[in-house]
Amino acid sequence: MAIYELRTYTVTVGKMNDVIELYKTLGWPALSKHPNKLCSYFTGDIGALNQIIHLWKFDDEADRRAFWNGVFSDPEFMNFAKQLRPLLQNQENKLMLGAPWGPQV
C-alpha cells in the first residue's frame, strides 16, 4: 500500500521569495536527479501563510527510506538544505495512507 508524506515548512516572515528562489535554483535541480516521488508543491493563499507544502508518494516505507537516504547523501541537495534551514521557522512531516474510497493520487 502506498505511503504519502506531507511535508510542511513554515518560512520566516519576509523570506518566502528567498525560499522560492532557492528552491528554483538549487533545490529542485538537486531533487530532480532522484526518482520522481513528488506529487506536487504548494504555497498557502488563505489560512496559514508563509508555508511551503509538498506531498510525496512512496510504494512503502522501504521505498521512502531509500529515496530520502539517496537525497540526503547528495552533496548538491545538502548544500541547498544548508542554505534553506536558516530561512525556516518550523518543519512538520506527516505520513499518511490513502483512504479505501475515492480517487488516489
Walk through the language-model features, giving the residues of each:
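Glycine-rich beta-strand-turn "strand-cap" elements at beta-sheet edges
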Residues: 1-2, 33-53, 59, 78-105
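Short, contiguous strand/loop micro-motifs
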Residues: 6, 14-15
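Helix N-cap motif at beta-to-alpha junctions
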Residues: 13, 57-62
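Short cationic/low-complexity microdomains
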Residues: 66-77
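Hydrophobic pocket/interface hotspot
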Residues: 7, 19, 31, 54, ...
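Short amphipathic alpha-helical segments
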Residues: 15-40, 71-72
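Short, flexible helix/strand-to-coil boundary loops that buttress conserved ligand/catalytic motifs
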Residues: 23, 68, 81
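Short glycine-/aliphatic-rich beta-strand segments at the starts of folded cytosolic domains
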Residues: 3-9
